[in-house]
């Protein structure tokens, strides 16, 4: 169906760019069961006297495939002196691939400091991050868990209908480049 509609558009005298806002990866074990790390539970076990808030940007009511679990999380730490210790504990979790303090995360990923947590985490390719097991009802999943938000879901299609483009000269193309290529091709 998708190919049919793209074909119809391509027949017109237009510049056409097809891309996506993000990729999607399976987040299950070999039995098809969800792979999730619940960071708030983990931190409360390691630091029972302290308060943490794990924020998952993916959390929304549409839980059909991702169960409100994503590959990206921000952690707010009440006791700021604990941040280096919390960072070290999270780095020990093999399924967490990237753990950065706020300053490094903002610099590396161009995040706004005033809206970022004290710690930023990203899971490995086949795992998701949740806050607390009690906050994620995975029984409503009808399909195997899939999600996005991390380093492994950045790859997206980028299709253009022009051979006049200089796209092959680009080392890195982002989905937000679609507007540039659509307008650039229109002028040729």
Where are these regions (language model features)?
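Feature captures the catalytic ectodomains and active-site-proximal regions of enzymes
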Residues: 1-188
């Amino acid at each position: 169906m998708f190919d049919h509609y793209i074909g119809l558009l391509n027949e017109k005298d237009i510049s056409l760019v097809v891309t996506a806002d993000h990729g999607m990866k399976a987040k299950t074990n070999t039995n098809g069961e969800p792979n999730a790390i619940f960071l708030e539970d983990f931190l409360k076990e390691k630091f029972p006297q302290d308060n943490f808030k794990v924020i998952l940007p993916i959390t929304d009511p549409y839980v059909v495939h991702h169960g409100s679990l994503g590959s990206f999380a921000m952690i707010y730490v009440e006791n700021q002196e604990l941040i280096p210790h919390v960072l070290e504990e999270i780095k020990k979790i093999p399924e967490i691939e990237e753990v950065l303090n706020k300053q490094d995360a903002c610099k590396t990923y161009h995040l706004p400091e005033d809206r970022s947590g004290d710690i930023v985490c990203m899971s490995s390719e086949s795992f998701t991050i949740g806050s607390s097991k009690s906050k994620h009802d995975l029984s409503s999943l009808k399909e195997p868990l899939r999600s996005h938000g991390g380093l492994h879901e950045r790859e997206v299609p980028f299709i253009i209908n022009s051979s006049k483009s200089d796209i092959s000269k680009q080392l890195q193309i982002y989905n937000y480049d679609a507007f540039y290529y659509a307008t650039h091709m229109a002028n040729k």
